[in-house]
Curated annotation (Swiss-Prot):
Segments of this protein annotated with the region Disordered: 127-199
Modified residues (Phosphoserine): 106
Molecular function GO terms recorded: protein dimerization activity; transcription corepressor activity
Any one Gene Ontology BP term: determination of left/right symmetry
The name this protein goes by in its record: Protein extra-macrochaetae
Main location: nucleus
Oligomer status and interactors: Heterodimer with other HLH proteins.
InterPro entries (alphabetical): bHLH_dom, DNA-bd_prot-inh, HLH_DNA-bd_sf
Biased composition (Low complexity): 161-182
Length: 199
């Protein structure tokens, strides 16, 4: 009998280990289980929000995050290239949103009285749009992921000259990188020829 308990205590027989009182030891609970479950929930939501996410295989957390970032960059590119973007004033929009939130906080008691009174349709539409949660569009209506070639900027520079200088600087950096890659690729065969001559 002692050999049986010795085997059980080491766990070599596949049976659970026994403690000193002869009871089965349970595995301690993991502290990160709640956090892990919450992270899985958020990753699952992200997978549902981003279109063209591979469904036929299990994705790592990093792959999911990369797809999300790529999709956000694509949306930002589309926003930047939208024809109305030139007419958009980000500072005025932010000021209007902040003013709307301040008005909602200070006038919460008066909201019931105003609702009964006649309200301007434009103001009503603005409030409804601000209060509605963002609707999730169907995956078919979303844009596909592509490689991003432009910098990650939301608002165009204030001066056109700065924008032009930034583009020229980026072009120079790309040319320098391509030249370095070319010189590295040319240097490798030359080194191989030298090594073969020496031997």
């Amino acid at each position: 009998m002692k050999s049986l308990t010795a085997v059980c205590q080491t766990g070599a027989s596949g049976m659970p280990a026994l403690n000193a009182s002869g009871r089965i030891q349970r595995h301690p609970t993991h502290r990160g289980d709640g956090e892990n479950a919450e992270m899985k929930m958020y990753l699952s939501k992200l997978k549902d929000l981003v279109p063209f996410m591979p469904k036929n295989r299990k994705l790592t957390k990093l792959e999911i995050i990369q797809h999300v970032i790529d999709y956000i960059c694509d949306l930002q590119t589309e926003l930047e290239t939208h024809p109305e973007m030139g007419n958009f004033d980000a500072a005025a929009a932010l000021t209007a949103v902040n003013g709307l939130h301040e008005d909602e906080d200070s006038d919460m008691e008066d909201a019931d009285a105003e609702a009964e009174a006649e309200v301007d349709p434009d103001i009503l539409a603005q409030r409804l749009n601000a209060e509605q949660p963002a609707k999730v569009s169907s995956p078919a209506a979303r844009l596909p992921l592509t490689d991003r070639q432009t910098p990650n900027t939301l608002v165009a520079p204030a001066h056109p000259q700065q924008h032009q200088q930034q583009q020229q600087l980026q072009l120079q950096q790309q040319q320098l990188q391509s030249q370095q890659q070319l010189s590295n690729s040319l240097a490798t065969p030359q080194n191989a020829e030298k090594d073969s001559r020496q031997s």
